[in-house]
């Protein structure tokens, strides 16, 4: 993937960039693997906003991705590399030898015409999925399960990867993108390689309108509102809000994650914490 930069013909084009899509081999999805995706606009069944800054955007169709990679012993050919509007990564359409078709996340160096497989006997090459116990130490992997058979949960975004650093009994130690080292059951599956489309993080969207096309609405600070709209609103002149950050309903917001979780026992080394200024 590369990035194409626009010339400054308008204020919105100045500094803006877009992916060149050179790796894409087809511009329409596989019909049997598409499902309708209904836009909720951040509302619940009562019509009340439960998630702010969502709404609008281009209509999308959901591509069903195979995150379990449980079709063992059947080789598949990469028929196409496609764009997926629902995620930052590209997806690869696989044609299995028995006629079945599935989508997977497209890793780096996976090309149209390549062959991939899954299972204990699969080779260690990009796109193949194996249990962690069968992957050599030091291998870079992505799309990792947290529970055996539960489907991939870790390292699914564009450009992300996890390194298998050690194996100790029933657990494999993985170095996360954040630097955290975590124990994961060796029976969990992972896909070899790094998720493709790594340059996606370098795209400059250029104007607010492109964010609206993606379904992201403006983020307005609470201190810029009136008291009727937000607990931080009002006051004479500029104010700091006068209390710990809360959402419009008054519930605490930001840095509210539980300090003790059952899964913390699986963390071998914490990620480096950024000191708040």
From Swiss-Prot:
InterPro entries recorded: NA-bd_OB-fold, Rib_uL2_dom2, Ribosomal_uL2, Ribosomal_uL2_bac/org-type, Ribosomal_uL2_C, Ribosomal_uL2_CS, Ribosomal_uL2_dom3, Ribosomal_uL2_RNA-bd_dom
GO MF term list: rRNA binding; structural constituent of ribosome; transferase activity
Highest taxon, organism lineage: Bacteria
Single GO BP term: cytoplasmic translation
Record keyword rRNA-binding present: yes
One Pfam family this sequence matches: Ribosomal_L2_C
Annotated GO CC locations: large ribosomal subunit
Record field: compositional bias (Basic residues): 37-57, 268-277
Functional summary from the UniProt entry: One of the primary rRNA binding proteins. Required for association of the 30S and 50S subunits to form the 70S ribosome, for tRNA binding and peptide bond formation. It has been suggested to have peptidyltransferase activity; this is somewhat controversial. Makes several contacts with the 16S rRNA in the 70S ribosome.
Subunit structure: Part of the 50S ribosomal subunit. Forms a bridge to the 30S subunit in the 70S ribosome.
Family: Belongs to the universal ribosomal protein uL2 family.
Protein name as it appears in the record: Large ribosomal subunit protein uL2
Species assigned in the record: Frankia casuarinae (strain DSM 45818 / CECT 9043 / HFP020203 / CcI3)
